[in-house]
Amino acid sequence: MNIKKLILVTLLLSFIYCEQTKKQKFVLEINNFQTDIEGKKTDLYQLKNEKIEVYITNYGARIVSLLSPDREGIMGDVVLGFKSIADYQKAKTPYHGCLIGRYGNRIAKGKFKLNGATYELPINNNENHLHGGPDGFHNQVWEVIAVNQNSIVMTYVSKDGEMGYPGNLTVEVTYAVNGNELSIAYKAKTDKATPVNLTNHAFFNLAGEAKGSINDHLLMINASHFTPVDEGLIPLGEIQSVEDSPFDFRRAKTIGRDLNQQVSDIQLSRGGGYDHNFVLDKESQGSMSFAARVVDPKSGRQMDIFTEEPGMQFYGGNFMDGSDVGKYGTKFEYRASFALETQHYPDSPNQPKFPSTILNPGETYQTKSIYKFSNSK
């Protein structure tokens, strides 16, 4: 082999090596997601373009993995998840990456009144109802009705009386990648008045799945107010200013900066840190607007969130304790991830001052949120 050929081969091998090392080692095996749950088939689907790569399963309509580049161009998985359907089913925290419904967040004492009737829901979070109950949408197999390289559409029919909720509710969700964005679009229709509050519960760590604490991440939330809570994390019914409080994220600060006030600040104390709904600043209700920005200074990864929803729950991983082990073999330790759940406010069916979450027959529930990924050089 002459010198020129040797140089070309060396350069080619170097290029191939560099391209391979620009992506985190892939650990998902599709057969671990292909199973049968009560006669319904589950599977794993890939959405991909030149910017981001997303893996979705129809079990819980959930995000399993999301890869985006850091400042060096190295693709890393920024969503916590598991290697198999079996691992999702046995996880201590059952909500990883899933679509939450019929009602995201908490409903006080699992009760609400609607059109003269009182409805009782399963209690699964101390004395309250959380995330649609133990067999909420996160625990259901969704039907895939369309899928291609850039999007997937899934549907689920929640029967009248399921988890105590009234009405047959037909839900549709579309996950789509466009450039460096992942969008989630929700639709729902009912044949009887019912509360509906859908969201996605992805747990993020922009350094990579469970790569240390998220307390050094920089966070900005476009919210001048939040909804304070009682000891059970049920809203008190007030809209409170974030001014001069640990809840002021209008200018970016590290997530952990004010956590030393957890003893002195009653709201941080009640949440064990941040687990609160923020009232987003919007020009008009229902408009698509900027909600939050998160930056990991070490990797340079940045995530911007836009939503049509009026609120967003910021959860700082306060209840993670290492019980769950993720797809890369890493324990999900205390504050190893955060969630930013676009939503209507918690307990709205019992809070007349909050924006209504009641969907009536003939109406269409429709909302969309966008997650935009970039990196700082």
Each predicted region: which residue ranges?
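Bacterial Sec-dependent N-terminal signal peptides
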Residues: M1-K25
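An exposed, glycine/acidic-rich loop-and-rim segment of catalytic or binding clefts
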Residues: E19-K377
